[in-house]
Amino acid sequence: MQDKYHLTLEQNLYLAKRNLIDSIWRSAKIEGINVTFPQTYAIIEKAAVQNVSVEDILKITNLKHAWQILIQEPEAPLTLEWLCKIHGEVAKDEALEWGKLRTGEIGVGGTDYVPPIPNADAVRVFLQQMEQIPSPTERAIETMFRLIKQQIFWDGNKRTAMLAANHIMIANGCGLILVPEKEIETSQTVLLDYYNHDTLDNAKQFIYSTCIKGIDFPERKRTQGISL
């Protein structure tokens, strides 16, 4: 799986900042939070907003704070401690515990899959294994799906996993993972199939083919295509 983009860190951070509200809005939609883009913008800008629950406002605000960490610390190593730090923002005042690994059993809606109770050492080994994947884009996508399936936290696993994936993408200049609005329903189907049948390759290909966003430089491509 080849990287689609080769941006500088500065370029990728610019991309992340430009797409901050869109990223948060799409994550909210994936989680089933019924908010519009203008409502998301208003919440992030701390403006008054109507017809949005307090719980949903909290989730969006928490996502904003988590994204701020990604932008402020783009080259921080992806460790268990970092994941807990991000989750501490994502699920603050929402999950049973935030910033700590899950210690009890949970189920996954729409599937019979029951994730095992996580072990800190096993999570660390998993993250080290992911570092061996040469392509940062593939590493980001696979890390995201495996974290989602492991459900290492009580709640907010999908949001945390997507943030972890984008952290890898940003640090390596590979663009962003953003699920287009028209593909959100398909993404849920792909994820359920992965839960039930471990169809990781299919899930990875879906994200790779439809959900990678970057900055194109047409003039650069044209120049590179000229033989001297």
Kindly label every feature range from the protein language model.
Residues 1-228:
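FIC/Doc superfamily catalytic core
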